């Protein structure tokens, strides 16, 4: 909104159906005229009398223009909010004319004497929810790359690997880049390559008191198999 704009709100009736046109660039614009007629009560005659009507041309653009063309018809009582504009032009006879128009910011039916049913139009679907196309999930980094734990490239611990991972390249609960606990190769043993609940990736050593870290090498006896459980 430019500085110095004259904001105006007008309640009136459409004198004709809106006219929808498109500019060469493809932008939609709808033009319609409304008549706002004041009414006063004459106590002498005990009747309502109409005053001089105010006629204004209204211009509305883009998506709202298409909605206006599909929703409003001649005779409907509407509420128009916008900016008052003065425009001068010259007729074919060479006479100069000045008219006032409203650049519409918002418009809708008046419900004082009528009912209306609103049909909401979705705007840019998939921009939210549980990890929709533009984020909005629990830990999603946008769209199908977030949302549920361990999915694709997100989850609860994306970028730093699970709950305790230090370099777990985009893991979930335990997924390296595949979602299921077990890193890149889907292993379920003690080698969580990229992520997991405590996996530090290939770049972080486990503490000395870690029972998995203190196990003898696989195949040398004891409890050393990669798929064996450590003693407690």
Swiss-Prot record:
Any one GO MF annotation of this record: single-stranded DNA binding
Organism domain of life: Bacteria
Gene Ontology annotations for the cellular component aspect, listed alphabetically: nucleoid
GO biological process: DNA replication
Compositionally biased spans, kind Gly residues: 123-186
CDD domains associated with the record: SSB_OBF
PROSITE patterns from the UniProt entry: SSB (PS50935)
Region called Disordered, residue ranges: 118-232
PANTHER family assigned: SINGLE-STRANDED DNA-BINDING PROTEIN
Name under which the protein is recorded: Single-stranded DNA-binding protein
Originating species: Corynebacterium efficiens (strain DSM 44549 / YS-314 / AJ 12310 / JCM 11189 / NBRC 100395)
GN (gene name): ssb
């Amino acid at each position: 909104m430019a500085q110095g704009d004259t904001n105006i709100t007008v309640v009136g009736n459409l004198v004709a159906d809106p006219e929808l046109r498109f500019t060469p660039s493809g932008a939609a614009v709808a033009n319609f005229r409304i008549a706002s007629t004041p009414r006063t009560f004459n106590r002498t005659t005990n009747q309502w009398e109409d005053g001089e009507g105010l006629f204004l041309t209204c211009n509305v653009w883009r998506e709202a223009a298409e909605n206006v063309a599909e929703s409003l018809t001649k005779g409907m009582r509407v509420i128009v909010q916008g900016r008052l504009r003065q425009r001068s032009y010259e007729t074919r006879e060479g006479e100069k004319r000045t008219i006032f128009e409203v650049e519409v910011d918002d418009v809708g039916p008046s419900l004082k004497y009528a009912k209306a049913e609103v049909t909401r139009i979705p705007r840019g679907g998939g921009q939210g929810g549980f990890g929709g196309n533009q984020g909005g999930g629990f830990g999603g980094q946008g769209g199908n790359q977030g949302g549920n734990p361990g999915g694709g490239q997100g989850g609860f611990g994306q970028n730093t690997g699970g709950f305790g991972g230090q370099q777990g390249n985009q893991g979930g609960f335990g997924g390296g880049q595949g979602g299921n606990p077990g890193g890149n190769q889907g292993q379920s043993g003690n080698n969580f390559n990229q992520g997991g609940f405590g996996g530090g990736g290939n770049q972080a050593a486990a503490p000395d008191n870690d029972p998995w870290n203190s196990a003898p090498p696989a195949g040398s006896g004891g409890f050393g198999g990669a798929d064996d459980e450590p003693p407690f």
